[in-house]
């Protein structure tokens, strides 16, 4: 749902909202873009460098990376983690919230190692990372092999039940702009997650 057409209708509303030609509502608040109420960060819509999560479990200024994730996300994750544990599986958050400045250093390192073209297929440029929203995380090993593990298979089949989607699904590179990442989950709530599944 995040790379929708952005053609605005000619009769834009005065409250900062626009309707796209496909009927989606785009709103900008404090420099961040929301489409139909969902905060968006992708190759089309960047977050300002000053953006911090709106509903962090722990204030960003007091938190380490993973603890400044959204409160609702963490509640859903803990339930998903408990259900996975009951099935003998071990899932954990390996990487959560990332500040704009951290993404600058991460992206620059990838560019230095692999070049800009390659880095752009697997890493977000600063401001374009969903990690800055506090609404996504990477699980376990953050490697392609995760999809073949029992945990990866279970996540693929069940994460939507808890309000998560695999944000960069297999075969959708042209749509998302990123290669498949079985470990990268985005919290969107159960209703939208089920539709996306």
Each language-model region and where it sits:
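Extracytoplasmic cell-surface/polysaccharide-interacting catalytic and binding patches
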Residues: 1-96, 100-197
């Amino acid at each position: 749902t995040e790379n929708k057409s952005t053609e605005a209708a000619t009769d834009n509303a005065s409250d900062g909202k626009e309707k796209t030609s496909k009927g989606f509502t785009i709103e900008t608040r404090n420099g961040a873009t929301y489409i139909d109420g969902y905060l968006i960060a992708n190759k089309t819509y960047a977050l300002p460098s000053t953006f911090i999560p709106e509903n962090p479990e722990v204030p960003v200024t007091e938190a380490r990376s993973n603890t400044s994730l959204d409160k609702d996300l963490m509640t859903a994750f803990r339930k998903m983690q408990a259900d996975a544990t009951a099935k003998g599986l071990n899932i954990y958050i390996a990487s959560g919230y990332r500040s704009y400045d951290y993404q600058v250093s991460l992206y620059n390192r990838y560019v230095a190692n692999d070049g800009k073209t390659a880095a752009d297929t697997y890493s977000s440029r600063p401001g374009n990372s969903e990690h800055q929203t506090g609404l996504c995380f990477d699980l376990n090993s953050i490697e392609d092999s995760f999809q073949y593990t029992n945990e990866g298979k279970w996540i693929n089949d069940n994460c939507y039940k808890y309000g998560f989607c695999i944000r960069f699904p297999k075969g959708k590179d042209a749509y998302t702009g990123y290669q498949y990442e079985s470990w990268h989950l985005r919290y969107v709530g159960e209703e939208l997650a089920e539709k996306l599944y």
